[in-house]
Amino acid sequence: MKGKIKMSTLKCKMCGGTLEINENETTATCEYCGTEQTIPKITDDVVGNLFNRANTLRLKSEFDKAEEIYNKIVGLDNTQSEAYWGIILCKYGIEYVEDPTTYKRVPTCHRTSYDAITADEDYKLAIQYADISQKIIYEAEAKAIDEIQKGILTISQNEKPYDVFILSLIHI
């Protein structure tokens, strides 16, 4: 039965559903949304609770607060690839939404950057500390996010400039 002991309960990064995590697993598939995803190394309940809190905040688009918690996790254990990945998701304002045609969870960017996600130091650290199965998922997600970012930047560069005036009416 080694490897089948219930280790910790975490929330899905995509939909917020409960993931049952077994010992030594580094990826899991959510039974609610079907997304295969990376999971953190849980060393104790404190770390598990911090990951769940950060994820909950990120799911509510409270990216700055979530990023603070991911940084706190890195302060406790600087080899947590999942914490670095969480920081990346917050920096780029990533929310996973359900595609109405495929029902798959796809990334949506609430924040745009001219820099590729793969050039970010936190991404490099996530890759450095990830195992092979986590790296595959991180690299695929980073590629998808980079494509979305490029699309957003292309659209914004093709927009005609316009002036915005703020008018205020003074009632006498």
Predicted regions: what they are:
Residues 12-15, 30-33:
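Short cysteine-rich clusters marking metal-coordination/redox-active sites
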Residues 16-19, 37:
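Cys/His-rich microdomains that often coordinate metals
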Residues 34-43:
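Short Cys/His-rich micro-motifs in 6-15 aa windows
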Residues 43, 47, 93-154:
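Short coil/linker segments at helix-helix boundaries
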Residues 45-65, 69-72:
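Alpha-helical segment of the N-proximal tetratricopeptide repeat
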Residues 80-81:
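Residue-level recognition of tetratricopeptide repeat
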Residues 170-172:
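Conserved small/polar residues in nucleotide/adenosyl-binding loops
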